[in-house]
Amino acid sequence: MNYSIDLADYGYNGECTPDVARVSAVHKERYGLITPFGMTYGFLKPGSYMLGDQPYPTAGDFVRIEFNPSGDSRIIETLPRRSLFSRMEAGPLMREQAVAANFDYVLLVTSLNHDFNPRRMERYLTVAFNSGASPVIVLTKADLCPDYQSKIAEMEISAPGVPVHAVSVYTGLGMDALGQYARPRATLVLLGSSGVGKSSLLNALAGSYEMRVNSTRDVDSSKGRHTTTHRQLIMLDSGAMVIDTPGMRELGMWCAGDGLDAAFPDVEAVLARGCRFSNCRHESEPGCAVRAALENGELDPERWRRYQALQAENRRSDERQALKRERQEHMKGIAMKRKELKRKGR
C-alpha cells in the first residue's frame, strides 16, 4: 500500500511506518486517527490498557496501531509524549484527565469582557508551564474593549515574560501576530473557559467557519456556552495544527511540577536567595528573604498569597495521589497473592 500522508507533516519525528498514527479526535471510546494511509477511526485493543501501565490516548497523541483497511483499527500503545496538558478530573474519583499531548504552544484564551481575570490566569500558566510547551496568552474580543492596551499591561503583571496578544476575529486586530506560532508542523492547543471565543479564534486561524459558534457578543453577558464538545486536532492552511478543547468550567490542579516556579518567577527569585533558616515558614522568622521582600515592596503581598494557595493545593494533590498509588499497590498485591494461592490449589 502506498502512503497518502506523511506523518512528519503532522509533527511526527520518527520513521513513518504503517503502525503509527496521530490521534485527531476523542469521541468517548472511539478515536479519530491520522495514519499514513489516510484518516480512519480506532478503538483501544482489549487488554492493552487494562493494567494501567500506560496512559490512555488523548488528542495529539502518537499511537501504535494495528491498521485495518476495511474498518476501525486497534490502538495498542501510546507512544512517549514530548508535552502534556492534564488536569484533575471533576468528581470524587481523583483521576488525571489528559487534555492534549505533543504540542509546541499553549494558547491560553480569555476574553476582554467579564471573563477577564489575570489572577485566574496564574493557575492556567502553572499547568501550562508544567506541560513542557510554551504558553501564549490571547485576549479575545478586543473590539469590545476600547482600553485593551491597559488590559494587556495588567495581564503582563500576572504573567511575567509570557507573550500577551489582544485580538479581534471580527476586525482582524492582532491576528497577524499569532502567525508566528502557526508555523508548519507546529502544534498549538487552545485552552480557556467556556464562551471566551476559542471556536471563533480557531475559525479565524483556519480561514473558515466550520466550527459551531454560539454568540456571546453581548458585553453585559459573562456566561459562556460550550461550542466545542470534544477534543480534536485540525490542520491549518499554514501547515500548523491546532488542538481545540471544550471550555473548562474549572481547572483542577493535578501536578504543578516546575510550573509553579515558572509561573511565579518573581517569587522564585526571592526564594532562591535563601532564608537564614532552611525550614523557614516565611512568617516571623528572622532573616526571612520573603518577609524582607514583602516589607520593601519588591514582592506583592496578594501575589505571594496566591502563590502559597496554589502551592498548598498542589501539595494536597500530591499527597492524595501518593495515597491512591499506595492503595492500588496494596490491592494489586492482594490480587497477586490470591492468584498464587489459586494456582497452588489452596
Segments predicted by a language model, with ranges:
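Conserved ATPase-coupling elements of RecA-like P-loop NTPase cores
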Residues: 117-119, 146-152, 252-255
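Conserved active-site beta-strand-loop modules that form the wall/rim of enzyme catalytic pockets
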Residues: 187-189, 195, 199-203, 232-233, ...
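N-terminal accessory targeting/assembly segments
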Residues: 1-118
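Histidine-anchored nucleotide/phosphate-binding helix
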Residues: 119-130
